[in-house]
Amino acid sequence: MAEKPLFHYDEARGRMESVRWLLAAAGVEYEEKFIHTNEDLEKLRSDGVLMFQQVPMVEVDGMKLVQTRAIMNYFSSKYNLYGKDMKERALIDMYSEGLADLNEMFILYPFDPPGVKEANIALMKEKATNRYFPAFEKVFESHGQDYLVGNKLSKADVHLVEMIYNMEELDTNILANFPLLQALKTRISDMPTIKKFLQPGSQRQPPVDEKSIQKTRKIFKF
């Protein structure tokens, strides 16, 4: 039996949370070795297992993969969440890269100083409701299918629903004008493995709070 993938990252959402969502959708079990201190991180660096001295890192299939998008693409290919041909993969990548822009803002805003944080929350909500969510709603309107590409679940659908949940933490009514995105959220949330992932006690990480912010700052020294 193949070993489970092993994640190395802070015990937080950060850049690993999208990978957690993806493997939940694929129904794949994994293990996590959390980095709790700067010393834990420095040991990984001194052991030479972090190609660019950065985490996340995933041990899988004899590899030590770094760079979140490379990790996502590998698992998407392995578990058939990456389209059937080059054209479908191009669309999946295009949608995923757009979502990555919004996700980057979401990952970083908790570390902003007061004033800046509130401004960035307002900016994220504005971009979600006026740029990103309308674009994806239009995709579903254009083809009338259940999923973004090829009428089959892909990493783009999973990442979109992850971002919907993230943005709903900032505004519970943010999907009010996007019925097709509401339907996608329900569809994916009802998948047994995602339903389990959304329950308390799963490997899904909770929203960032002040304690986790301070811990992350100490680990990464910023």
From Swiss-Prot:
The keyword Kinase does not apply. One of its GO terms (biological process) is xenobiotic metabolic process. Coiled coil: none annotated. Its EC number is 2.5.1.18. It comes from the Eukaryota. Glutathione binds at Y9, R45, Q54, V55, Q67, T68. It catalyses: RX + glutathione = an S-substituted glutathione + a halide anion + H(+). It is found in: Cytoplasm. Residues 3-83 form the GST N-terminal domain. Signal peptide: none annotated. Residues 85-208 form the GST C-terminal domain. Its main location: cytoplasm. One of its GO terms (molecular function) is glutathione transferase activity. It is an enzyme of class 2 (transferase). Keywords: Cytoplasm, Transferase. One of its GO terms (cellular component) is cytosol. The keyword Cytoplasm applies. Homodimer or heterodimer of GSTA1 and GSTA2. Belongs to the GST superfamily. Alpha family. Conjugation of reduced glutathione to a wide number of exogenous and endogenous hydrophobic electrophiles. This is Glutathione S-transferase A6. It comes from Rattus norvegicus (Rat).
